[in-house]
Amino acid sequence: GRKVATLDYDLASKKVVEHIGATMVPATVATFAPRFNNGDVDIAYAPAVAYEPFEMYKGLGEAGGIYRFSFAQMNFQLITYKDRLPEGFGQSSREFFADHFDLGMEHILTAERGIPENYWIDLPDEQELGYLDMLAGIRDELAAQGVYDTQMMKLMKKLRCRANPMHHECATDLLF
């Protein structure tokens, strides 16, 4: 019965909310934090880098918590006017971001370290494995439906495995 601020265009998040038996409350990137901070919703998806700028600590108060678990992965697109940029800009942008992957990961880890330890909640191993299986199933379902691009799926797996090399899906990449 918990209310979850959910980007209503994000099919994966909607499926997670359905799976856990919560109620989806449509939100945007501009409204998810205010809804959480004002108590309109019980749960909000947010990356660690949102904690400070979106003042998520206001909604957490003394009794709130943050699961030390990635329920969602976010990505972004650079939206431009193609005719206003030099030839090859798209490829050079992709190469720039690929070359600075480690810097981006460090930015995320710095944000996580900036969140007070008392807010972090560790899931029991069995529950974490259940969520990992649920999320993998949702990804597979959305990929089969053509919602997820298979190349993007490979990149997102790389991100998950970089963040947690012991993640169960990364074991398939290990050579013994």
Report each predicted region and the residues it spans:
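An extracytoplasmic/periplasmic, membrane-proximal ligand-sensing/linker region
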Residues: 102-176
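Bilobed "Venus flytrap"/periplasmic-binding protein-like clamshell domains
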Residues: 1-38
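Beta->alpha turn/N-cap motifs
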Residues: 9-10, 28-30, 44-54, 74, ...
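Sec-exported extracytoplasmic/periplasmic mature domains
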Residues: 22, 37, 41, 98-106
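A bilobed periplasmic-binding-protein/Venus flytrap-type ligand-binding module shared by bacterial periplasmic
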Residues: 73-92
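A ligand-binding cleft/hinge motif common to bilobed small-molecule-binding domains
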Residues: 15, 33-38, 44-63, 68
